[in-house]
């Protein structure tokens, strides 16, 4: 974890770094790319919130905020249905409250975020646009649209098998992934078994949580080991998935698997850098579900003794993937 440090100065006791690039990182301000964010209402009601003033609600139970306040010391997703219902409600309210362009810009400003990966357009220059597949279209039309999106500036592909109701092992997913994989562009997907709607919701059957199971992502990586694939949330938010993901990566010798830090504490972030490699870890928050501030603090704590590695995780690794 301290690869870049070459020793300590004879008189100063300060870390000594080998290259001018490494020295320069010590002198510059913190650079941050948030590799996992959302703008607008991503759920089935699709409320028109992006260009409206930020909404505010009376205080409500918010497990996302509680988790951040506790420094991500436990899993986000539990098997307790009552707790899951509270989480689902909070996720919808946070989307409406913090998912507008105005609220997003405020969060970027307050947390000094240089860029954030999201699905939308270039109206905010700090938002780096990814696109997603329109699985309603026939495969040839879907692929043609994705190619047009790339020409218009899409820097990668985002998949959400639960909310899109299409597993990662579906032929339509393969077709979309191949468009980006063959061009060397990154492909990220939600991973994790979690409900987005409470029991009885008319939308719950349209968002099967089992499509977030890790084995779907592992099958996709095995099919396309040469593509840049990024399992979000380090495989999931139940607390154990990142270890299973890392075991598979090492067992098969997959060289192009990256992952992100969303909802992970400093200890787990250090583990992720060791398990996947310091060049394969991307800072991410899953904003607006996380408020950014505590995620930044956790990442700073994780790599406080290695500013070069901190810059890689916060900025450099993502910048290389996105050709910035």
PLM feature spans:
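Mid-to-C-terminal alpha-helical segments outside catalytic/metal-binding sites
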Residues: 4-35, 42-95, 99-106, 115, ...
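Short aromatic-enriched loop/helix-cap "lid" or pocket-rim segments at secondary-structure transitions
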Residues: 43-49, 142-143, 199-202, 241-244, ...
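A structural motif corresponding to the C-terminal end of an alpha-helix
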Residues: 106-116, 123, 219-229
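Conserved, mostly hydrophobic/aromatic
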Residues: 36, 108, 157, 180, ...
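Acidic-and-aromatic substrate-binding clefts and catalytic sites of carbohydrate-active enzymes
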Residues: 94-98, 135-141, 163-171, 237-240, ...
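Histidine-centered divalent metal-coordination motifs
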Residues: 36-42, 190, 233
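Catalytic pocket-lining loop regions of alpha/beta-barrel enzymes
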Residues: 155-156, 169-282
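Active-site gating/metal-coordination segments in enzymes
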Residues: 15, 19, 23, 114-200
């Amino acid at each position: 974890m301290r690869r870049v440090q070459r020793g300590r100065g004879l008189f100063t006791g300060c870390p000594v770094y080998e290259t001018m690039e490494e020295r320069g990182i010590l002198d510059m301000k913190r650079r941050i790319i948030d590799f996992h964010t959302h703008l607008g209402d991503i759920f089935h009601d699709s409320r028109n919130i992006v260009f409206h003033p930020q909404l505010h609600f009376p205080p409500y139970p918010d497990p996302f905020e509680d988790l951040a306040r506790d420094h991500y010391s436990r899993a986000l997703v539990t098997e307790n249905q009552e707790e899951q219902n509270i989480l689902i409600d909070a996720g919808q309210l946070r989307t409406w409250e913090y998912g507008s362009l105005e609220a997003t810009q405020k969060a970027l400003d307050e947390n000094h975020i240089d860029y954030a990966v999201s699905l939308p357009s270039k109206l905010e220059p700090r938002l780096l646009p990814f696109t997603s597949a329109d699985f309603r279209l026939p495969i040839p039309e879907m692929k043609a649209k994705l190619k047009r999106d790339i020409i218009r500036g899409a820097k990668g592909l985002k998949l959400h098998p639960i909310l899109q109701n299409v597993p990662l092992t579906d032929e339509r997913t393969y077709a979309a992934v191949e468009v980006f994989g063959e061009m060397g562009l990154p492909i990220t997907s939600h991973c994790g078994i979690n409900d987005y709607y409470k029991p009885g919701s008319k939308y719950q059957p349209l968002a099967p949580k089992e499509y977030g199971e890790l084995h779907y992502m592992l099958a996709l990586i095995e099919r396309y080991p040469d593509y840049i694939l990024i399992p979000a949330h380090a495989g999931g938010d139940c607390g154990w998935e990142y270890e299973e993901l890392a075991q598979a990566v090492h067992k098969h010798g997959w060289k192009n698997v990256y992952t992100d830090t969303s909802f992970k504490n400093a200890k787990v972030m250090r583990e992720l850098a060791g398990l996947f490699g310091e060049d394969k870890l991307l800072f991410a928050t899953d904003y607006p579900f996380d408020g950014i501030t505590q995620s930044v603090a956790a990442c700073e704590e994780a790599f406080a003794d290695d500013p070069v590695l901190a810059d890689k995780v916060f900025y450099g690794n993502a910048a290389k993937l996105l050709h910035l």
